[in-house]
Each structure stands twice: as structure tokens, then as C-alpha cells.
Regions:
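Short, well-ordered beta-strand elements
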Residues: 39-51, 72-77, 102-103, 150
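Extracytoplasmic "Venus flytrap"/periplasmic binding protein-like
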Residues: 64-136, 170-172, 271-274, 288-289
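Short helix-initiation/N-cap motifs at beta->coil->alpha
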Residues: 78-90, 181-187, 256-269
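C-terminal lobe and pocket-closing loops
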Residues: 114, 281-292, 304-407
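Extracytoplasmic/periplasmic solute-binding protein
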Residues: 146-154, 159, 169, 184-231, ...
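Glycine-centered hinge/linker elements that transmit conformational signals in sensory
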Residues: 187-192, 228-257, 300
Length: 438
């Protein structure tokens, strides 16, 4: 997940300073949450990161809310995700929840671990004015524990397949040929394109599991069962994913690189003819301004011979949590319900400058989301991606999600080098069980 947060903003916003702190009206920023009786009835404190993306969105949300609540004040404290996690853990384990802000931003894949581990640290938002039906089920599922909603969804991590249309044309293909296809069809066409142009279709960072998890979730697969227990051995979907990945590598259609910078470079330097990742990768693609008009977006390939296989998945994203330390939990819930969970104009405002693509489904019908994007062949890609998000299958992340991802990534590395798939899957599951103390 390296540099995922930095990569989510679009090209124009990527050049913005990442050092400034944001606040919207009223009180200045401070290093932590509220203290003692200092909280005011019309004031909220928020922890989040990235001035050009998350902080900017919060500032604009405050402006929207202030139209009907002119005395409302929002203090945004720029806090990197790693620090949010550390401070949250410290506050929860020390039972000192007053050190937390009213609202904090949490990575979707970290929700289950934090809410299950620290159930007293978060407010249940179910029945607090947020209409969760306005968001994709797969998105809200990240922050639902025991049937209760603990997060208001924000940014979109819907998976996309992006292709260099000029390279496809050189080999006799169009992006339409890559829409609603299977991975075997993808590999077959990829081998043909490689032979004709010398360019692989796909690249990824060796030793990371993002593509594996995208494939797995596209069929509703998980590394854990519904009770949070490791479910890798005997997991037909996982085995199919690994087999597919290894086949792509051995065919030359997928090329592995050493790090994130090299991965981005394969696209911007025209080494590969496409990529498959969360939609935030569009920001990195668009840094190659000379390629404008030569990219197209469509859905991802699906697995064959697997139940519930789809052409849709997810990678990344985050949601807003209201903490149990909030002195104004009703205000926090109302603020989120009127902005991130209730305002299409808000999302229309933040999209052009930050590239903050919503998971709020009504936004997909707005004129702004439907505007053609010259870089991507004049297609309305934002509306397209929002539609993709509505079709993503849910999966079980579990408390030990990141440990499981790492174990699977190690297994993949070994299998690509010739190790037995079943043995590596068992080793991965044993590794997670050990981490869980089982």
C-alpha cells in the first residue's frame, strides 16, 4: 500500500504542497483532540491527512454546512495515517478517549481491526441521520461490525483497468475488446500485443498483494471466513487467483518491478500498455501529460470457473469515524450526514480540484461527474467509475487483514519462483494463525 494516499489526488492537485495544514473558520489548530470542558457546542475537531485531498474536502464540507449553520467551526489537524493509528491505539488502550478528536479518517481496511479491538472508541452511526443505502454495499461493509455502521464513506477505491489506446490500436485492438472479459482472454490478447508491440499489458510491484486482493474481491472472495478466522487452505478462489497471477507473469503479459516509483514509471515512460488498480492510480497516469487522449478506462477482467465472479473490485479508500471521545457526537453525525452523506453539490465542488471521487451514489448523476475527460479519450470516466463502485462485491477483511495480505504476498513470490501453490497457501495460513495466537 505504499504511497497510496499520495497517489489518490489527480494530476493538477498533485503539485499542491503537502506540508500546509488546513482549517475552516474559527479556532486555530492544535496538536490533539479536545481537552476538558474546552469543547464548544458548535465546534468539531477532525484528524486526517493530505492537505490537497482529505483536508481540502473537509474544509469544503465545512463551508457547505456553514450555509445553514453559520456559527459552525471546524478545526482540521493534519495527522498522517500512521499517527492517527498510533494515537487511536494509545487512547483506547489507556482508556483516555478524551484525547481523540470528534472525527477521524480511517483506512477502510483498518476499520474491522480497530472497531473490533477497541469497540468503546467509536460511536455507532446507525440511525443518526446517515442514509447508508446511498453508498455501495461493498463500501459500507468495511465499517460495519455486528450490523452497526461505524463509518461514513468517503473516497472511491473502485478498481479500474486503464489502457493505452494508441498501443492497443497498433496491435489491432480497442478498449472495447477489453470490456467485460475474462483473465484468460486478457492474457491471450496481452500475449498478442506483447508480440506485436513489445509492451506488456500490466505491471505491479513484486512482493505486494494489491493485484491478488483485487482479483480475489472481484469474486467476493476473502482470506477470512465470516467469523474472522483464516480461510486460505481449501479456498478455491484464492488458488485460482494465484494460478492466474503466475500465468500472467510467466507469459510476459505481467511484468514485476522492484518498487512504487518503478511501477509508476512503467506507465509514464510507456513501458507497459496498461494497468489495473484502484481508480486513484489515474493521478499517477495523468502526470504523463504527453499521453493525454491516449488512455481509456474500463472494468477489470474476471476469473473463470469461479462462483460469483464479476468484473468489479476495489483497492483502497477511507471513511470518517466519530469517536467516543467526542463532546459533540450529535453535531458530528449531523455534519457528516449533511455533507459527505448528503450533498451532491459538495462532491461536485471537490472533484475538479482534488480528484476526490465519491462513493456517494447520487453524485454519479451530476453534470460534473458526467463531463468528458480529455485525458481519457473524452469519456465521462468519473460517472463510469462511480457505477463500477456500485457493483463491487463485499469481502471479509478481519482483524488480521494486513498480516494475511503480507503472508499471501510472500506465498506469491515463492510460487512465481517455482514453489508448490498448496504448500505456500498452507504456510500463509499458518503464519496468520501464529500471529493470531492460534
Amino acid at each position: 500500500m505504499k504511497r497510496r494516499i499520495a497517489s489518490i489526488i489527480l494530476a493538477g492537485a498533485m503539485m499542491a504542497s503537502l506540508t500546509a495544514c488546513g482549517s475552516s473558520g474559527g479556532a486555530g489548530q492544535n496538536a490533539g483532540g479536545k481537552t476538558g470542558d474546552g469543547a464548544k457546542a458548535n465546534e468539531l475537531t477532525v484528524w486526517c491527512w493530505d492537505p490537497a485531498f482529505n483536508i481540502y474536502a473537509m474544509e469544503e464540507a465545512a463551508k457547505v454546512y456553514q450555509k445553514d449553520h453559520p456559527d459552525f467551526k471546524l478545526n482540521v489537524v493534519e495527522t498522517p495515517w500512521a499517527d492517527v493509528q498510533t494515537k487511536l491505539t494509545t487512547a483506547a488502550t489507556s482508556k483516555n478517549l478524551d484525547t481523540l478528536p470528534d472525527i477521524l479518517l480511517m483506512l477502510d481496511n483498518a476499520y474491522q481491526k480497530n472497531v473490533i479491538s477497541y469497540p468503546d472508541a467509536f460511536k455507532d452511526l446507525t440511525g443518526n441521520g446517515v442514509d447508508f443505502s446511498k453508498f455501495p454495499t461493498a463500501k459500507t461493509a468495511y465499517s460495519v461490525v455486528d450490523g452497526k455502521n461505524y463509518g461514513v464513506p468517503f473516497d472511491n477505491g473502485a478498481a479500474i483497468a486503464a489502457y493505452r489506446t494508441d498501443v492497443l490500436k497498433e496491435a489491432g485492438y480497442t478498449d472495447a475488446d477489453f470490456t467485460d472479459i475474462t483473465w484468460s482472454k486478457y492474457q491471450s490478447m496481452g500475449e498478442d500485443i506483447l508480440a506485436k508491440t513489445g509492451k506488456p499489458l500490466l505491471s505491479c510491484t513484486a512482493g505486494e498483494s494489491d493485484l491478488i486482493m483485487i482479483m480475489l474481491q472481484s469474486a467476493g472472495g476473502s482470506l477470512f471466513d465470516k467469523d474472522g478466522n483464516p480461510s486460505m487452505v481449501g479456498n478455491d478462489k484464492l488458488k485460482k487467483v494465484i494460478e492466474t497471477y503466475v500465468s500472467l507473469v510467466k507469459s510476459g503479459v505481467l511484468v514485476e518491478v522492484n518498487d512504487w516509483d518503478q511501477y509508476v514509471g512503467t506507465m509514464t515512460n510507456s513501458t507497459v500498455a496498461g494497468t489495473i488498480n484502484g481508480c486513484w492510480i489515474m493521478a499517477s497516469i495523468q502526470t504523463a501529460e504527453d499521453q493525454s487522449g491516449n488512455w481509456a478506462i474500463t472494468n477489470i477482467p474476471k476469473l473463470e470457473g469461479v462462483s460469483d465472479a464479476t468484473n468489479y473490485s476495489n483497492n483502497g479508500g477511507s471513511s470518517w469515524a466519530v469517536t467516543a471521545g467526542s463532546k459533540n457526537p450529535e453535531l458530528a453525525a449531523d455534519f457528516l450526514s449533511k455533507t459527505f452523506a448528503g450533498s451532491v453539490p459538495f462532491y461536485e465542488t471537490i472533484l475538479p480540484k482534488s480528484g476526490a471521487l465519491a462513493t456517494y451514489l447520487p453524485a454519479a448523476d451530476s453534470k460534473v461527474y458526467g463531463e468528458p475527460q480529455a485525458f481519457f479519450g473524452g469519456k465521462p470516466v468519473y460517472a463510469q467509475i462511480t457505477e463500477f463502485a456500485s457493483k463491487v462485491p463485499s469481502n471479509n477483511t478481519g482483524v488480521y487483514y494486513y498480516e494475511a495480505r503480507d503472508a499471501v504476498a510472500t506465498a506469491i513470490t515463492h510460487v512465481v519462483s517455482g514453489a508448490d501453490i498448496d504448500s505456500e497457501i498452507k504456510t500463509a495460513e499458518d503464519t496468520v494463525k501464529f500471529a493470531m495466537g492460534k
